[in-house]
């Protein structure tokens, strides 16, 4: 083993699991390869072949219930919480009922989607383990990093072939490609990198269920209430029949879920009878006892409350191909059960959450190669703490501290933690949150709850008490209402950087040569700005209309039934979420990435071409076409123009003008549920692949370099006036205009050392939110340590860093994404 380089400053806080079990569970996870488990989709397919005559809502429920009831109830060594999504420690269900094409293309050795060639995956950790084991005769490799047992490979191929013409993606393509008059624009958008790859393989998520009702009522009571609706049903018009379909579907999936849980109870009982170790036997008996009660009935104690939550959360996860499906406000949900259970000590609660977080991290997803690269394997499960209750009082509690401590100890990538900020929050809670940040894992992220309340008051008009109670984060950084919203289902991202390419080259993509927009005379700065805006408008409008077509196919192939049961108003209305059953249907967003690069480039154009007349517009554009080779002096001048993130009025105004135009245009289009699209801007891993498809920019960025991440994060190396200037620039934005937001800041560990360092960071957050900002997150890491981790990855298997709205294991990140994190400006306080 290599000896770690000691010329860097390590993290101040180094947590360790609280007990032997937690340490074992974490190590087992880290040592496991990534696996594909076809069991669920095999049973779903078997049912689908027999249910062709059924109405789609009831058919979807029947197929899902059948699959649930036939899944193997796997209880791993040392588990005390029952329930797993797959049979493996790190397992993914291939949802070929959503998209079979990407798997079949790989099996047939056909070309993947246009963006797959720009996709990079990590090399280490579980990925390396899978690739090594794939060299053996027992396994085949899928999607570059997942193993499938060789004896299941041909069966999986047959399942994919069955779904090839029936899956959601194929049904959607048949619809929009035959009707939509901008279909060619969409396909060219994928080829050029104007858009992220097709999102049908994993469209759903950013969804949080009503776990409060699930726990308090239990499934049996919900089944009885729904059956009463069915029995008392009297149609008033022909459309009322859809209510009956949904209610029967709801009962079907709930009964399937009860069988799923009962199978775990039976398995635990069988294992307990055979177990020789007295302590393990008691654990299995306790597990079986809990599984005979929850989630069918209300929990009797804290452990059962956690088990009940986990079953409902897991069952919702199994139903759909989710990214961003989240646990929500777990401290508020579970605190009453903890407070009223004298037999559960803080230490016991910490251990239980440590196990829960391992189980959440064990859930993997497999999709198209492009989306695996964009997501970097993260499911964006977001657990939000703190904030206010419905009455406006602070909502942090003892369980908030316990959850933070559990992640300080474990440092798992799932769930990412977040904090709803309010000045009423307890200082001990905030200091514990900063302690977690100082481990270097990049969470919790901090969100200004008052900004989200303003946004929701504008978009939904719901009472402020309702918004406070249900406010949560679904996915990376997207606020939503827990148990009340459809989720934030969107098409993917628009690449603002590619639009710069199109402006520079008169509507032609310089990489592929495809014409995306008509040429235009550019005489003034306003001409350049308006050309950019017009192309952006065209790209967004076409993207939104395309997605509206796609979601028609979603409703007709893979509507969410189980999840709809636990979203308010669906059962009352007799409508699933795809039919508009949720309370909130305005949460559908349009996403984009790279606007900071646009603002920087326009600022340089304005300064060098039109204000100072250092060069002509064509000279500057030619410099970017040549990747600045032979134009080094001009590039130096471009880099010398103030960029975003330095509290400089000129570039900040340009950014604000772009931002508000984007918000207004997005909100001017109607989503597939008949409500305005909600503007949002995020990043996930898009800065790397989006940057790869772009030429050099006028702001000094070179060809292929990543774009700026997030919404208001500066381009790496250009924020030269310190973190206070960064937050001043970001504070100029009205963050209540969008559903989401992200500001990345990176600090050297020495900058936050000790209690004074923690208080200084809290003061910075407080200043930002009072200005008012919306979201901020931190990497607290020495860049030299990250460089050492690139050189000696074997010494850093459990190193976690913040990427965008999520954290990831360093060794499982691509080299390009690692470089992007290293490249970010390292600040001091």
Please name every model-derived segment.
Residues 2-247, 279, 283-290, 294-829:
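Conserved catalytic cores of very large enzyme subunits
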Residues 248-259:
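Extended non-globular scaffold/tether segments
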Residues 259, 263-266, 270, 286-289:
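Extended, non-transmembrane alpha-helical coiled-coils
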Residues 261, 271-282:
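A conserved hydrophobic secondary-structure block that centers on an alpha-helix together
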């Amino acid at each position: 083993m290599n000896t770690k380089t000691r010329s860097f400053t390590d993290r101040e806080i180094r947590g360790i699991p609280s007990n032997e079990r937690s340490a074992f569970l974490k190590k087992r996870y880290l040592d496991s390869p990534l696996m594909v488990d076809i069991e669920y989709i095999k049973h779903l397919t078997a049912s689908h072949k027999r249910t062709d005559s059924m109405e789609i809502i009831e058919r979807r429920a029947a197929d899902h219930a059948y699959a649930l009831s036939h899944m193997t109830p796997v209880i791993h060594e040392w588990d005390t919480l029952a329930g797993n999504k797959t049979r493996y420690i790190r397992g993914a269900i291939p949802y070929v009922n959503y998209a079979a094409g990407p798997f079949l293309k790989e099996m047939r050795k056909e070309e993947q989607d246009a963006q797959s060639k720009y996709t990079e995956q990590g090399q280490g950790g579980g990925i390396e383990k899978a690739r090594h084991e794939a060299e053996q005769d027992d396994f085949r490799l899928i999607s570059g990093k997942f193993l499938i047992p060789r004896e299941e490979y041909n069966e999986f191929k047959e399942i994919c072939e069955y779904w090839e013409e029936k899956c959601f993606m194929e049904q959607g393509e048949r619809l929009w490609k035959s009707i939509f008059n901008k279909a060619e624009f969409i396909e060219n958008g994928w080829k050029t990198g104007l858009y992220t790859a097709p999102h049908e393989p994993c469209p759903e998520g950013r969804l949080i269920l009503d776990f409060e009702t699930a726990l308090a009522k239990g499934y049996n009571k919900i089944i009885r209430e729904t059956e009463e609706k069915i029995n008392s049903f009297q149609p008033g018009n022909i459309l009322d029949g859809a209510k009956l379909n949904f209610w029967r579907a709801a009962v079907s999936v709930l009964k399937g879920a009860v069988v799923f849980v009962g199978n775990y109870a039976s398995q635990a009982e069988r294992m307990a009878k055979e177990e020789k170790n007295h302590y393990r036997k008691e654990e299995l008996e306790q597990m079986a006892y809990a599984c005979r009660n929850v989630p069918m009935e209300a929990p009797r104690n804290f452990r059962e409350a956690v088990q009940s939550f986990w079953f409902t959360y897991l069952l919702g996860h199994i139903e759909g191909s989710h990214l961003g499906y989240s646990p929500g406000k777990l401290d508020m949900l579970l605190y009453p059960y903890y407070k009223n259970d004298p037999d559960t000590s803080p230490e016991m609660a910490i251990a239980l959450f440590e196990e829960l977080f391992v189980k959440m991290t064990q859930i993997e997803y497999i999709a198209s190669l492009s989306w695996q690269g964009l997501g970097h394997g993260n499911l964006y499960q977001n657990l939000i703490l703190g904030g206010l209750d419905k009455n406006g009082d602070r909502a942090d509690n003892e369980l908030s501290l316990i959850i933070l401590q559990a992640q300080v100890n474990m440092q798992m990538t799932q769930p990412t933690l977040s904090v709803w900020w309010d000045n009423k929050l307890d200082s001990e809670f905030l200091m514990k949150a900063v302690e977690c940040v100082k481990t270097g894992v990049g969470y919790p992220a901090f969100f200004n709850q008052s900004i989200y309340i303003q946004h929701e008051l504008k978009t939904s008009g719901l009472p402020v008490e309702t918004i406070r109670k249900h406010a949560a984060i679904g996915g990376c950084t997207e606020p939503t209402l827990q148990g009340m919203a459809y989720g934030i289902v969107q098409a993917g991202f628009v690449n603002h950087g590619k639009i710069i390419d199109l402006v520079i080259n008169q509507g032609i993509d310089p990489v592929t040569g495809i014409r995306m927009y008509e040429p235009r005379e550019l005489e003034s700065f306003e001409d350049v700005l308006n050309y950019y805006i017009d192309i952006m408008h065209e790209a967004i409008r076409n993207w939104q209309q395309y997605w509206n077509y796609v979601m028609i196919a979603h409703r007709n192939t893979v509507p969410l039934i189980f999840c709809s049961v636990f979203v308010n108003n669906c059962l009352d209305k007799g409508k699933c979420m795809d039919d508009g059953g949720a309370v909130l249907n305005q949460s559908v967003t349009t996403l984009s990435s790279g606007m900071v690069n646009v603002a920087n480039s326009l600022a340089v154009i304005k300064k060098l071409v039109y204000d100072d007349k250092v060069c002509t517009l064509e000279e500057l554009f030619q410099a970017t076409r040549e990747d600045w080779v032979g134009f080094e002096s001009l590039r130096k001048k471009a880099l010398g123009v103030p960029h975003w993130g330095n509290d400089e009025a000129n570039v900040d105004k340009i950014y604000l003008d772009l931002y508000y135009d984007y918000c207004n245009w997005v909100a001017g289009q109607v989503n597939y549920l008949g409500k305005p699209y909600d503007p949002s801007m995020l990043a996930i891993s898009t800065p790397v692949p989006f940057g790869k498809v772009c030429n050099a920019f006028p702001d000094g960025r070179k060809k292929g370099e990543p774009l700026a991440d997030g919404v208001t994060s500066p381009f790496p190396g250009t924020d030269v006036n310190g973190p206070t200037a960064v937050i001043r620039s970001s504070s100029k934005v009205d963050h209540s205009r969008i559903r989401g937001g992200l500001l990345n800041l990176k600090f050297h560990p020495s900058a936050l050392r000790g209690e004074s360092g923690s208080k200084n960071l809290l003061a910075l957050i407080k200043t930002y939110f009072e200005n008012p900002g919306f979201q901020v997150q931190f990497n607290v890491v020495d860049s030299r340590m990250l460089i050492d981790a690139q050189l000696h990855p074997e010494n850093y298997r459990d190193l976690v860093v913040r990427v965008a709205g999520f954290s990831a294991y360093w060794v499982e990140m691509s080299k390009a994404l690692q470089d992007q994190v290293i490249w970010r400006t390292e600040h001091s306080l």
